[in-house]
């Protein structure tokens, strides 16, 4: 499954156990822990990530599911204008894969905390 359209990186409320995890609960697929590079912050009380290939690594989850393309318009609406969907690399079990992620456009902090 090397198609980024069938992979989604989640790091906040959509992650397993998160308050909005129910939006992905109906999909069949495989969850794996992963690492992503960038800056982590918050916006309106929710985690917000900005991709930076030179930034520190942060823990996240990767969902691989053939059903993702079908629900992405719904997720785009849910995330709204505060987030944009990008394709970035994620490190999963020692190898890099390309996957989609919702990156925050805004932050409540002046500078994203590199260690968050």
What is each model feature region?
Residues 1-116:
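Glycine-aromatic micro-motifs
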């Amino acid at each position: 499954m090397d198609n980024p359209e069938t992979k989604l990186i989640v790091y906040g409320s959509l992650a397993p156990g998160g308050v909005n995890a129910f939006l992905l609960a109906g999909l069949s697929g495989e969850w794996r822990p992963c690492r992503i590079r960038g800056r982590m912050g918050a916006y309106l009380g929710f985690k917000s990530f900005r991709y930076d290939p030179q930034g520190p690594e942060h823990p996240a989850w990767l969902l691989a599911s053939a059903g993702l393309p079908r629900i992405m318009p719904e997720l785009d609406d849910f995330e709204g204008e505060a987030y944009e969907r990008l394709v970035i690399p994620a490190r999963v079990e020692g190898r890099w894969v390309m996957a989609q992620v919702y990156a925050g456009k805004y932050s409540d902090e002046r500078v994203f905390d590199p260690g968050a």
